[in-house]
């Protein structure tokens, strides 16, 4: 006979008797109890894992939300700094340099590349719209020529119809009234086309200013990273080199300009200045093309030759 101590267990199962059948029943009960305990442990682990995943998901969403807010606030700070710089001589803060070097890296490069691509796409669409407007004007001119010819034919008909009865005269007068109405419609269409031309010119001006500001910001980043500055187009969309001006790639290039060249640059960018200014003209031009690095802002300009 076996000792009951050999069948001690954590489930308070009674020990079997000396028969083999009773021992098998005891073993089956013990196995079911163990399986139930393991399932319960696995279920607890699964619930703990799900809670951990939910916590990580909430943490990640919170971090993303906070980062988006920070990026938005930082972008707003940059825009305000640029706006203040354009409205007056505001010293560009040094924390922008540190922030650009430590946080942005190549992000500005990619952003400006996408903005240039979007700007090129907008320019292509504007060019297509202008071509369509030109085509429409040509068709309008042809239609007006045809209308003039139709009027001449109407006058000839009226001369002949004067010999006919008065009833027929009334009908042709009605035709003339219709032609006058058509003329008025064409005049109205011409006015609308002229208005659209003015809007297109306004859009072109805004587009050029947008390109100018974009290139200015790009040069600020390139200057901080030690790269040569890219050419900043004038407000009319022309490149400075097309006007016979030397390119500006670094602050030393500005120092080598003559006063006439410096004035021509500032006028192209729409910058106001006093004719009596000398070195300040160079500083204005430096800030306008985006040479905002510490080395550029601390550079000592010389008088014009």
UniProtKB/Swiss-Prot annotation:
Identify the InterPro entries for this entry: Mug135-like_C (IPR013902)
Q: Which Pfam families does the UniProt entry name for this protein? A: Mug135_C
Q: Could you list the residue ranges forming a coiled coil in this record?
A: 27-63, 120-207
Q: Tell me which domain of life the UniProt entry assigns to the organism this sequence originates from.
A: Eukaryota
UniProtKB keywords: Coiled coil
- Give the UniProt family note: Belongs to the UPF0612 family.
* Protein name per Swiss-Prot or TrEMBL: UPF0612 protein C337.02c
Organism for this UniProt entry? Schizosaccharomyces pombe (strain 972 / ATCC 24843)
């Amino acid at each position: 006979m076996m000792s009951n101590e050999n069948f001690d267990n954590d489930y308070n199962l009674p020990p079997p008797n000396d028969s083999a059948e009773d021992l098998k029943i005891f073993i089956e009960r013990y196995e079911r109890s163990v399986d139930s305990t393991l399932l319960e442990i696995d279920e607890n682990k699964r619930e703990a894992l799900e809670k951990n995943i939910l916590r990580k998901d909430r943490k990640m969403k919170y971090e993303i939300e906070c980062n988006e807010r920070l990026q938005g606030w930082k972008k707003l700070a940059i825009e305000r700094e640029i706006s203040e710089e354009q409205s007056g001589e505001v010293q560009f803060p040094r924390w922008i340099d540190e922030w650009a070097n430590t946080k942005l890296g190549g992000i500005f490069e990619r952003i400006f590349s996408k903005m240039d691509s979007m700007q090129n796409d907008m320019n292509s669409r504007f060019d297509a719209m202008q071509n369509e407007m030109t085509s429409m004007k040509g068709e309008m001119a042809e239609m007006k020529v045809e209308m003039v010819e139709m009027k001449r034919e109407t006058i000839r008909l009226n001369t002949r119809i004067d010999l006919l009865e008065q009833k027929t005269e009334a009908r042709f007068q009605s035709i003339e009234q219709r032609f006058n109405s058509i003329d008025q419609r064409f005049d109205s269409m011409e006015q609308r086309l002229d208005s659209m031309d003015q809007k297109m010119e306004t859009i072109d001006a805004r587009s050029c200013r947008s390109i100018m500001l974009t290139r200015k910001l790009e040069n600020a980043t390139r200057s901080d990273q030690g790269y040569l500055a890219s050419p900043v187009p004038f407000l009319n969309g022309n490149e400075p080199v097309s006007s016979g001006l030397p390119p500006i790639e670094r602050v030393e290039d500005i120092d080598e300009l003559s006063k006439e060249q410096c004035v021509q640059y500032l006028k192209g960018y729409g910058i106001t200045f006093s004719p009596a200014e000398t070195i300040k003209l160079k500083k204005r031009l430096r800030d306008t093309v985006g040479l905002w690095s510490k080395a550029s802002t601390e550079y000592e300009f010389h008088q014009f030759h």
